[in-house]
Amino acid sequence: MIYIHKKIKNPIKDGIEIGEEIKRNVGRASLIIFITSILERDKLKQVFDGMKQHIPLDNLIGCSTGGTFSGKDYIKEDGVLILAFDEYYKSAISCEKVDREAEYVGKKIADKIKTCIRDKYPKLDIDDNFLGFVFFDWNVDSEQEILDVLGRELTIPIIGGTAADDGSFDKFFQIYKGEVVKDCCVFGVVGGKLKFDLIYGHGYEPTDIYARVTKAEGKVVYELDGKPAYQRYLEMLSEYTKLPMDIIKKYFYRDLRRLDFYLVHPLGFMDINGNYITAFLERVEENTLVFRRDILEGSFLVLMKTDIEKQVKSIVDELKKAEDFENPLIFINECYGREVLKNSMFREFEEDILKYFLNFYKAGKKVEEYVIEDNCIGWLSYGETIAKDLIRFHNNLSFTGVIFELSQSSNINWREELKNFNFEDDEIEVIVNLINKQLTAKELLQLTNLSQTKLYHILNKLEKEGIIKSVSGKPKLYYIDNIKEILQKTHEKIEHENMVKKIKRKKLLRLL
């Protein structure tokens, strides 16, 4: 598994380089997650055209984003974040237009995934772990409902989010097999001997100000405490901040480009586990509040609070789970709104900022002391998704993610280590290029400095000795079935040969 985080300057050239890097490091990737802040379709197509010169895109899924990051390195525009899984993993992908009820769409996706896995891999290992990646469209507005179906039907952990753009909410899209799609649910799974753990957080805490939902239907709340919902929300903000209503109204919501009361003090509720979570407000219609999730009549909504330290600390605390991994890689889906709060790159400059908002940045501990390592990569979304065990949750103003254990074999210097198994240099060159890959003779010629005659001689020799195997076809594919098992047999063969030589040496010495 590898990741690529890159600013695209020359689409065709950069696409070719990306394709080369994926092919060189993982071969025919079983699954490619492709997240991009390239919002111009023609430019993105050129990147894909470049990649296709070296790799197929039939297992590539993803979406647009408002920005990507690797550690503290952010790319806001024309960037790509790619996660490519080695070809020995099992995978399947699906894409469905969300033009019918969520139950139908979710079940159709799940059925396609199950059928594909069953047909491609008739025999699954008992220790195979599967992980799902899902990418939604903001305009569809049925993320939670579809996630519930996917989680129920597939019973695997799922991570992902809603496609985003530059804050304009009119340029986002999804990606399926290297093609731009809209109004869909794009889904993929990857599995095998894959160690991972999921993370989630939001960085908000409840205040002691709350209101009862006295009239609601689905995602629309009409009344709080018997008053028009929007009016009561403004009152709650005024009560907590001690600011007059005209100031609250002026700075209530400002198009996801500047700090406002909605981002600092969203409404929230208590989940079934007793944890407080945010309830994302999509819009205000007259005096009603329209949320991105169903709000139950009779429940309570609480005013939430946060500051810069809580926002940063929330993600750092979750990343402590990576301490249980020897060589972790963390992939994060983070709400665009969180970056507006904590990253000036995503905010418009204000000369005269409201004094109350300055308190947001007065952290008790320097934010710089919370270190985000370079092995933490991610993208900015308009909604964050997680399904783990019985928890199936799509939210906003939050983050979800997955911690992977990277294979320790990626740190092995194969060219040096294989010399200890009595392989010749030219044989080592072929073996190194076939580890975790399936390649044709033509591809091996491009990757090695061997002549065609020499290469075919080595391929025949290694195949005869059982070091490599091949799949008949046009062209023929060469691969290594199990590198550990092969090296173990080679080691035992060397030990046996050494023992025979040792016995013969002793026999000769006795005769002298």
From Swiss-Prot:
Q: Name one Pfam family in it.
A: FIST
Concerning InterPro entries, the annotation shows: ArsR-like_HTH, FIST_C, FIST_domain_N, Tscrpt_reg_TrmB_N, WH-like_DNA-bd_sf, WH_DNA-bd_sf
The record, for PANTHER family, names: BLR0328 PROTEIN
Q: What is this protein called?
A: Uncharacterized protein MJ1623
Q: Upper lineage ranks?
A: Archaea, Methanobacteriati, Methanobacteriota, Methanomada group, Methanococci
